[in-house]
Structures are given as structure tokens and as C-alpha cells.
Amino acid sequence: MSGEYFSQQNGVYIPKGILPDTSFEKLYLLVRQKEQRVYSNAEIVNLPEIATHHKQHYEWSVRKDSCKSLIRYLKKKNQFLRILEIGCGNGWLSHKLAEIPRTEVIGLDINLTELQQAANVFTKSNLQFVYGDIRKNILQNRQFDIVIFAGSIQYFSSPTEIIHLALENLTARGEIHIIDSFLYDAKEVEAAKQNCREYYREMGIPDMANYYFHHLLNDMYQFNCTVKQQRTSFFKKLFLKRNAFPWLCIRHAL
């Protein structure tokens, strides 16, 4: 990243003139602590592998499968790829993506605590971690071949807005991939919202519900969207232990 526009803090690139906003980060980290999703350096370096007795083992088995599928797909392109992961968290997936030959990867997030941990643990020369919100054009319209939302699209209030912005940062033949997030049918979204509010209220952090959004799968079809993997029904998820998340690929309009 250019020293003209960015400074470094503990290995993380921060746009000059931007002061980190910790309002969301504090709530988010508090939730993650209660959910046992704050990991040590020794743990994140091995993700998505995690101890079988860990509370989040099933979740990570799902993420392991989606990670493998995505990396297999990207490797088949057999070309140089500039990759942007929006909402990279502790950086485990960005690190895995950077292991693909001929890639340059940027992990972007507004959680400075996890970004600093990521920069400390994952130090590959083709991997950088950047603090900031893509909606503020902090990347100066830099172009990427692949933009990934992995378990992060639900933290953006408007999928239409964020996908349009991602498309602006996408090369002509580039792709946006959305994985590891629930996308709902219209008939189930209100119940999901209510369950979310109750979940955070019972946790003692009700304000977190204001930062978690429930997007409709149908809203994604306004774009040039291909379903790489269908979402799994509740029955199959419960009894067959299959990934309940869809995998969507969005390209520029034809």
C-alpha cells in the first residue's frame, strides 16, 4: 500500500487522516468473547482446523469445506489474481488465499484489534491487512480480480449498495464471491430478525442486533449472479450436517 495514503500501525495499513471508530468493534468483540470466538495466535494460525471439543467445531467444519471449495475454484483459473476479502476478521481466510500461487491478497476490516492480530500472525509477502470501510473509497478505486465476502455480508445494511461498490473495485472479468452467510426467503426473514434480537438480548448485548442485517436471497438476483452452491434446507442442515449457506458468484452485467 502506498505510503502517501497509508500509515502502518502494528502491521496494519490505516488510511491517513482516518481515526479508527471503535463503537462497532467493542460490541463485536464482546459478542465474540461470549460466543468463544476470540482465538489465540496459536489457534488462528491453524484455522479452519480446530479442536474437536471446541464449542465452534461444527461451524469451522463448515467453513473448512467452503474454504476448500473456493480455493479449488480459484486455483483452476491458473492466473495471477488480485484478491480482496471484505470483512476479513482475524485474517485466517486471507492467509489461506495468499497460499494460492500468483496471488496478491488484501484483507480489509473495521476491527482493528483482529486486524493487528492477523498482521502479527500472518506475515506472507503477498498479504496485507488494511483498516477501513470500503464505502469510504479508502482503496482509491483499486481494481481486484476477486472480491470475497466470507461471513461478512450480513454486517452491511444494504446489499445493493455494497455489491455496487464492490463492482466498482472489480476488474472487467472479475468476480465477487459471497460465502458463509445466511440469505433468506421472504417468508422466513421476519422470524430470523426476531430470533436475532432475542439472541443478543439474552446475551446481554441487545445493541448488537442493530449491526446485524438479514438479507434476501432474491435481492442478489438483481445482479449478474450465479449460484455456485444452493443453500441447504433446515432439514438437511440438521440431520445431514450439510452447509446451510449458499455460495454466490456475481460478475459485471453482460
Language model region names:
Residues W92-K136:
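Class I SAM-dependent methyltransferase SAM/SAH-binding core
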Residues E59-Q79:
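Conserved alpha-helix/loop element of class I SAM-dependent methyltransferases that forms part
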Residues G174-F182:
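Conserved beta-strand signature within the Rossmann-like core of class I S-adenosyl-L-methionine
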Residues F156-A166:
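A short, conserved alpha-helix within the catalytic core of class I
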Residues M208-T226:
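Short alpha-helix
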Residues M1-R37:
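N-terminal auxiliary segments of SAM/dcSAM-dependent transferases
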Residues E190-Y211:
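Conserved Class I S-adenosyl-L-methionine
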Residues I148:
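A conserved beta-strand element that flanks and buttresses the S-adenosyl-L-methionine
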